[in-house]
Amino acid sequence: RIMCQTVYYFFAMSRIDSSGKECMFTVPTGNFGDILAGYIAKQMGLNIRTLNIATNENDILTRTLNSSVHELSEVSMTSSPSIDIQISSNFERLIYDNCKDSSYIRSIMSDLNNEGKYTLKKEILDKIKQTFCSYSIHTDEVESIIKKYMQKFDIILDPHTAVAIGAAERNSSKYDVSITLSTAHPAKFKDTVSSIINNNEFVPEHIINMMKKDDNLVILDNNIDIIKNYLKENIL
């Protein structure tokens, strides 16, 4: 999945003239997968100056970059649920790439499991911050961003994209080019978005029709051969 997501960054940069320019990508993220793909693209030579980590109230990544302490807290339920997590399973991959020390990774992961936190070494954090920054955008600001972009640009954002837009606006003035990765069609979060803009006409008709269909639930035994046979007979 991360390999596929790396293509997003090359595709976006192919659409602009970025030569000699300072470029920033802002990505809404909880599990650190999509933005890790951006880091890989940068390591491959793509002209990315900064990767901006956009978080919501569940701001463990923002707090880590600001303080070096990666500490778990209670998960807050927000309008951007894909960011509502505390353990970013891909973040340790970034740490490893900036220290190349598997024993250190095992040590901090043990601290996280046993104590609920770890502290990054200064030299590792400093190296990470050469590429990454991070901003936390809360739910009330998400709502105002969705309203603003609807009124000003006639663009309907889903809540995750609004988180990213908010984070980008905090930092974009420093760069020649600012690109924000969008997450999903707003119809995926119809109830949240429609309550903010007082309109639900943005939901495509084919999705409306799909949601009217009956659910089809099949319970299978926990057996790989049974699952394979079901897929062959009913789907493939």
Residue ranges and their predicted role:
Residues 1-236:
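PLP-dependent amino-acid enzyme catalytic core
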